[in-house]
Design a protein with these regions (language model features):
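Short, charged, surface-exposed hinge/linker loops at domain edges
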Residues: 1-4, 33, 37-69
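Short aromatic-glycine-(Arg/Gly/Cys) micro-motifs in beta-strand/loop hairpins
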Residues: 8-22
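A short, exposed loop/beta-hairpin motif centered on an aromatic-Gly-Thr core
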Residues: 23-33
Length: 69
């Protein structure tokens, strides 16, 4: 399972990370590493909320999850 994080640097020097498979997931950091860590933390939070509310998950994750009936 992989959810790629795209990292880019803003003109002001800050970094931000985006995960295309999870619309709205974007986090900033002072460094590339901080932006990646903040984005990973946000991904986990978003996935947990989706599971909690019975919402759909990205196709790439569904294959790797066991679903309790």
């Amino acid at each position: 399972m992989t959810l790629p994080i795209e990292l880019e640097q803003e003109d002001d020097g800050r970094w931000f990370g985006v995960v295309d498979e999870l619309p709205g997931v974007m986090a900033y950091g002072a460094t590339q590493e901080q932006a990646a860590a903040a984005t990973r933390a946000l991904v986990l939070r978003v996935l947990a909320e989706r599971i909690e509310h019975g919402e759909e998950l990205p196709e790439s994750l569904v294959d790797f999850m066991a679903v309790r009936a």
